[in-house]
Amino acid sequence: MSEPHRVQFTSVPGSLNPAFLKKSRKEEVGGTEQHQDCEPAAAAVRITLTLFEPDHKRCPEFFYPELVKNIRGKVKGLHPGDKKKDVLDPFNDEEKERHKVEALARKFEEKYGGKKRRKDRIQDLIDMGYGYDESDSFIDNSEAYDELVPASLTTKYGGFYINSGTLQFRQASESEDDFIKEKKKKSPKKRKLKEGGEKIKKKKKDDTYDKEKKSKKSKFSKAGFTALNASKEKKKKKYSGSLSVREMLKKFQKEKEAQKKREEEHKPVAVSSIEAQGLRELEGTSDPLLSLFGSTSDNDLLQAATAMDSLTDLDLEQLLSESPEGSPFRDMDDGSDSLGVGLDQEFRQPSSFPEGLPIPLEKRVKELAQAARAAEGESKQKFFTQDINGILLDIEVQTRELTSQIRSGVFAYLASFLPCSKDALVKRARKLHLYEQGGRLKEPLQKLKDAIGRAMPEQVAKYQDECQAHTQAKVAKMLEEEKDKEQRERICSDEEEDEEKGGRRIMGPRKKFQWNDEIRELLCQVVKIKLESRDLERNSKAQAWEDCVKAFLDAEVKPLWPKGWMQARTLFKESRRGHGHLTSLLAKKKVIAPSKIKMKESSVKLDKKVSVPSGQHGGPTTLLSEHQGGGLNTGANSREHPSQATCGLTDSVSVTLEDSLDEDLVRNPASSVDAVSKELATLNSRAANSSEFTLPTPSKAPTEKVGGVLCTEEKRNFAKPSSSAPPPTNALQSPLNFLAEQALALGQSSQEKKPEGSGFKELSCQGPLSKGVPELHPSKAKHHNLPRTSHGPQAAAPVPGPQVKVFHAGTQQQKSFTPPSPFVNKLQGPKATSPQCHRSLLQLVKTAAKGQAFHATMPASSGSSPASSSSAHKTTASNSTTISHPAKLHPTSSVGPSYKNNPFAGSVSKHGASSSSPSPGGGAQVQSSVSGASLPGVQSPSAGQSASRAAPSSAVKKTPVTQKLTLVAPPGGPNGDSGGGTQGVAKLLTSSLKPAAVSSVTSSTSLPKGTGGAVLLSNTSSLSLLSSSYKSNNPKLPGAMNSNSLGIITQFPLHVLSFNADSSAKAGVSKDAIVTGPAPGTFHHGLSHSLLAGLHSSPPHTAPLPHAAVSTHVPQSLPDASQLHGKGPVVPRKL
């Protein structure tokens, strides 16, 4: 099988690869005949190397493959057959490739090979544009220097550069012959192609035509300006002299005509003989350029080469049209026709001496012109000596006072003498002036720097002292904050903490430089000098002036101060006296808008004073309900608004504590109060149309006052919260404040607190409601009077001042619990049954029976102040569940039955269920918290409806009696006390009372069918907790009820605040209600939303019980607050 493979490999004719042969022989023969077979193919090669002593220039180098090739080449040369075979060898690709390249190189050398370098022909240089269309604007050969440089010269650094200025030349050395060949190869090639065909002829003449064209342009179209290369042209007048240019041109003309005839007569094949003849003709003479300038010495040659680039912009035929006469150094005033003089005449015609110059300026211009003539032929660097620069600077300064036209004429005139163009001369003069002005600035800047150096040490030392003091104060403050941290957490809600942090943020001492008159004066002086040195002509806009001053101050003046001590804007402001006349043209007064944080702080302060609710999460619901609370007497509206409130609540539940959901109320406190007043007025007008009751017009001023006083007083009353309590939030406080404000507007005159028992305080406020001025108990003079004018529907009937008793049940507070959105939805669901509410009430009664020494907390709200307040003010006993302690409650004020044999007897009237079901946001909300997990906002109409309608009549017939409300709230206010809870409950009472009927009877009768707007709307009527009159003189309430079902919740103490409210202004029924509400900070999400939403969604009815009221005491660890509602109320626990 191996044989066919070998045949395939060796089938190519020619000698086989030695390696391949070796391998095959090894395999077959075993290597015995290997040497004989391989000898012919791989003959031994002897190489002789001659070594020499290496030095720094060279050392012996040998390339073995090359040596072997050379020797084998000789051998192959002896055997042409072998060579042939070697080329055909398929494995010798390198050799084949080399042969191909050599053949290709020979071919190109024959075709394009460089001929002997010929001398430049004068015709090529003078008439380069011959035959081109001079009207063609596309061709531009103005920079084709390479066509003009003599063969014996080269550029200084080799090569040609477009638009890089004047070229400098040097003699070409023999060692650079290759470079010159490469560079000069174009000329003969172009010449040959030109003679050979039209196409290349045009390419060759590209360069020269545009030179002529550009020179004509500069001469004729720009008559008012000198050529940019005017200086170069002047240099050539030195070298004009020995040769008659006219004779040369005649000779060139004859040559051209003869050449044309030859081209027409002879075929292109004859081109080479014609060219050879022309070359022989020209070779006999010296370099035409040398003959043109009349000298062949190297020195003159270099000078001529230096002047050659000026030919770029000249029309040589015109410039050389007159034969030169005289010495190349003759004076300019000589009117001869030298090359330079002709040039000067051509280009100096437009720039005549300007007239009307001041005598000093005219004198300086003539001096400069005379100096230019004396130094004629000098380069720019040599010409502009110190004296010339001084004269030019003087001319620049004087021409600044003249018009721009005269100034331009002066420089145009000077440019005709000087070795530079007008633009270059103007730039040089401006630079000299700026440099001189910069020298003027050095001294004032140094003075300013010295003054700053004298002032800085003292200020730096002062700054360091301030930094040290600041550091010490910061450390002290940190220590103090650590000590007060727990107390501050209890006192401040989240929002207040954020605001205080923002307000208290203490920045370190600033590096503020203290200016003195000396430094300010030096700064203004520096700025004035800088402005004087600025070009007034080109920078006349005020904005440009301002930018210039700012850039100067930032770049040159600001660094004079140590880093961080000065800012450019401060420098600009302090130096306004120096630049104001230029920079103030476009200056605008900047109106600095107050920062949002400051606005928020001020509005919060205003809120504290005016008692406008600013709860974090109650805001949107409150606003929604306020604006929508107008016409809610129809069942459709009442259903509509609870859903809207529900949406607002669910949306806001997930909001973080830092978000103020009541921002509108915070920013527009007056508008929110106005909205409430308008709403109450609307309710009043609607109620006036009904036969059952009339609502008096509310007054909003007292609400604001009393709210503010109440806030401050409650803060004082509960000044000492337990340190273990978590920091409360404002979320509850704001809506409660709003509600309490309304409740207090009903006529509570004053509040006072005194410590009682184990940490209990009694706040008793007595005062006739009609007067609105509180009477203080002598023993409680430390508290503020709470002036109250009658506010809302209850203000109609004066009622004796009630006593308000506040009990601190304990110091523990539960953390705020935000009910989840699904739970809120459950609370707002429309399908709660009244039996559930009754069941919850019964459970509440049972737990109350088990309670120890506290009054019954409101069953409807397991700690929800709004429910009880609403029940007390707006519901009669018939339509509310009355829970009374037999020893301490009068049943007289309660229309419904009261159970006296139980510590907490709840009279749950069917009217309540019926009334709540028709009410869009009334008593239903109170029981919703009691009703348990479902807590529907929509009440199904039941038999209780008829009872609720019947109850109002009986209630209306009763005589007006004082109404007492007992609010139970856990500790925790803005200051860590339970004042926030009291205030919140009071506000809740009022808010629920304002829109609702004055008496519970009236509210129940007037309640239209609908769903409660609050989250915790219930089917049952609002609960009048302890509706039978409660003895105000009895300071103690029944002990905390331990609810088995709510064991987790019962551990949190509640404060009990009892105060009377004139709720039965029209019905004339006095009621005592105990409202249990959590501390304002314990829950900030659900309560405020549900309260406000329910409150405003059903204005004419009892206040909605917020879902938050139920969930306030539920720890956040609980999975769902809805589990707790049906199990019993949260009651105060005796410590």
Swiss-Prot record:
Listed Pfam families:
HUN (PF08729), UBN_AB (PF14075)
PTM N6-acetyllysine: at which residues? Answer: 222
Record's Gene Ontology CC terms? Answer: bicellular tight junction; centriolar satellite; nucleus; PML body
**What are the Phosphoserine sites (modified residues) in this protein?**
173, 175, 323, 336, 338, 493, 660, 677, 1028
Q: What is its main location?
A: nucleus
InterPro entries linked: HRD, UBN_middle_dom
Q: Where is the composition biased (Low complexity)?
A: 792-804, 856-882, 905-934
- According to the UniProt record, where is the region Disordered? 1-38, 77-96, 171-220, 253-280, 480-503, 603-646, 747-985, 1094-1135
Q: Using the record for this protein, list the coiled-coil segments as residue ranges, or answer none.
A: 476-539
Q: From the Swiss-Prot or TrEMBL record, what is one GO molecular function term? A: DNA binding
Which intervals carry biased composition (Basic and acidic residues)?
Answer: 25-38, 79-96, 194-213, 253-268, 480-493
Q: Which GO terms describe its biological process?
A: keratinocyte differentiation; nucleosome assembly
Residues the record lists as Phosphothreonine modifications: 166
Q: In which tissues is it expressed?
A: Expressed in bile canaliculi in liver, in bronchiolar epithelium in lung and in tubular structures of gland ducts inside the olfactory epithelium and tongue epithelium.
Explain the purpose of this protein: Acts as a novel regulator of senescence. Involved in the formation of senescence-associated heterochromatin foci (SAHF), which represses expression of proliferation-promoting genes. Binds to proliferation-promoting genes. May be required for replication-independent chromatin assembly.
The record's similarity note reads: Belongs to the ubinuclein family.
Query: Which protein is depicted?
Result: Ubinuclein-1
Gene for this chain = Ubn1
